[in-house]
Structures are given as C-alpha cells and as structure tokens.
C-alpha cells in the first residue's frame, strides 16, 4: 500500500552512518547524485550499486528496507524504461505495426531507470539514518553562508525538513482513509485506470481536511514551545566534523575520480 513509501522516514540506530555529521551526509548524497549522471558503463553502475549496499550494511538497516522505497514507484520506473524502448531512434531489434524497439532505446531505458532507482535509494538511505531535527540543523548550517545575501537559512531548512517528514505522515493518513472507505464497501483495486482514479475522488476531501488539521496542530505545537525561528536558537549537540566525516569526504572524492576516469579515461 501507500505506507510502503519510505522516503522521509527515520530508522533509529547508532551505526557509524547514523553518527556522521548531517552536513557530510547531505553533501555526500548531492555528490552521489552527480556521479549517477556521470556513470555510463556497467562497471560504473556496479560501483554505485556497491556503494549503496555498503552504506546500508554500515548503517545496519534491515534487509529489504531500502528496497521498499522502490516498490511504490515501480510503475514510473517501468514506464520510463518502456518509453525509451519505443521512442529512441537506433538499430531496430523488434517491430510490430507502429511500435519499434531499438538497441539504443533498450540501453538508454535501462540506464535512466537505474538512475531513478539509485537516486531514490541514496535519498532514502540519508533519511533513514538522519533524524528530522539533525537534518534541519545540517541544511541550515550549509545554507548559513547565504544569509549574507538575505536568504532565510533556518526558515528554508525547517520548511524542507517539515515537507520531507510530512510525506510518510500524509501517506499513512491516506492509507487510513482508504481502509475506512473499504470497510464501507469502497473498491479501489478493480476496474480500469479511469475507474480506479474516479474511485479515489472520495478520498481527496477528507485527506485535505486532515492535512490542514495536522498542519494547524503542528503550528500550535510550535507556538506553544515558543518557537521563534533560528535567531538566538541554541542546540543540545553542536555539529562538529570528525575523522569519519573526513574519511567519507575522501571516499567520495576517490569515487568521483574513478568514475570520471571510467567515463573519459586519462587525458593525453
């Protein structure tokens, strides 16, 4: 169901990945995303997949937890692959009426789908190992230099974190409403796509009402705790870079150099 979406959820732990500075993890994820688009060979993608597997092992995440983040989006991933199969020009491998599958389309379709999977996995790995509060502190710290040009660093960080954390909350609420409707005889699994979409309409109004209610409750809770933004705000634990963060930075740099070499080789 919709609760299978894991992006935005935090998995408590005390692994070396959990203990990394949030700024290190955020920068590492951004760096990894760049490398995903840099990869262009099976070996490159194998290295990136190995990095995710190693990260999940070091974070001591349960087997299959990361893979759950792919399940809700498998239709989008599959659709991306199929579209490339039949729309990209190249050497024809199979033809039926107006549909032509090309070799280049298959290669590009697999690449694009794999990129989507890797981007989703690395994002989920970060949110699994970083609590919302720590993630907010990390984003705020990275945005702090932009305060000189008027960028509200803390407010932006808080908005981004609340939005990210609200994803699983909203999905849980949707699942709860769907189960309540199903107990009253609603059917969301049968019929064609149009009928299923029409059957989802009764969910929208209670979902909107519930979302506004939760947002109002959050605002009241923040006011009750005298929340006044980032000005003068202190932290229980200050962010400090350690040896593990430096080692992570070196690993990411080495990985980038390796992928750049695999893509372009040694310049003459």
From Swiss-Prot:
Pfam (any one): CbiQ
Subcellular locations according to the entry: Cell membrane
Topological relation to the membrane, as annotated: Multi-pass membrane protein
Transmembrane segments: 26-46, 47-67, 73-93, 116-136, 151-171, 246-266
UniProt entry keywords in alphabetical sequence: Cell membrane, Membrane, Transmembrane, Transmembrane helix, Transport
Main subcellular location of this protein, as a coarse class: membrane
Gene Ontology CC: plasma membrane
A GO term for molecular function: transmembrane transporter activity
Source species, domain of life: Bacteria
Disulfide bonds: none
Assembly, per entry: Forms a stable energy-coupling factor (ECF) transporter complex composed of 2 membrane-embedded substrate-binding proteins (S component), 2 ATP-binding proteins (A component) and 2 transmembrane proteins (T component). May be able to interact with more than 1 S component at a time.
Homology family: Belongs to the energy-coupling factor EcfT family.
PANTHER family with a match to the protein in the record: SLL0384 PROTEIN
Summary of the function given for this chain in its UniProt record: Transmembrane (T) component of an energy-coupling factor (ECF) ABC-transporter complex. Unlike classic ABC transporters this ECF transporter provides the energy necessary to transport a number of different substrates.
Descriptive protein name: Energy-coupling factor transporter transmembrane protein EcfT
């Amino acid at each position: 169901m919709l609760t299978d979406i894991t992006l935005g959820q935090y998995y408590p732990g005390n692994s070396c990945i959990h203990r990394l500075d949030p700024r290190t993890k955020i920068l590492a994820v951004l760096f990894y995303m760049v490398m995903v688009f840099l990869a262009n060979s099976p070996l490159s993608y194998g290295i990136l997949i190995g990095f995710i597997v190693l990260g999940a092992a070091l974070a001591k995440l349960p087997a299959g937890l990361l893979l759950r983040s792919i399940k809700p989006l498998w239709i989008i991933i599959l659709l991306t692959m199929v579209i490339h199969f039949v729309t990209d020009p190249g050497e024809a491998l199979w033809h039926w009426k107006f549909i032509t599958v090309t070799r280049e389309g298959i290669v590009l379709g697999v690449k694009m789908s794999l990129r989507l999977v890797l981007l989703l996995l690395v994002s989920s790995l970060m949110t699994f190992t970083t609590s919302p509060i720590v993630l907010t502190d990390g984003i705020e710290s990275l945005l702090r230099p932009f305060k000189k040009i008027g960028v509200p660093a803390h407010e932006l960080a808080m908005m981004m974190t609340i939005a990210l954390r609200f994803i699983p909350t909203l999905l849980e609420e949707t699942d709860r409403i769907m189960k309540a409707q199903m107990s009253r005889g609603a059917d969301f699994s049968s019929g064609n796509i149009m009928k299923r979409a029409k059957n989802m309409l009764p969910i929208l109004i209670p979902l909107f009402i519930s979302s506004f209610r939760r947002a109002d409750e959050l605002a009241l809770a923040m006011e009750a705790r005298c929340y006044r933004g980032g000005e003068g705000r202190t932290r229980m634990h200050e962010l400090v870079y350690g040896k593990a963060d430096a080692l992570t930075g070196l690993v990411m740099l080495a990985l980038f150099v390796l992928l750049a070499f695999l893509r372009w080789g040694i310049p003459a």
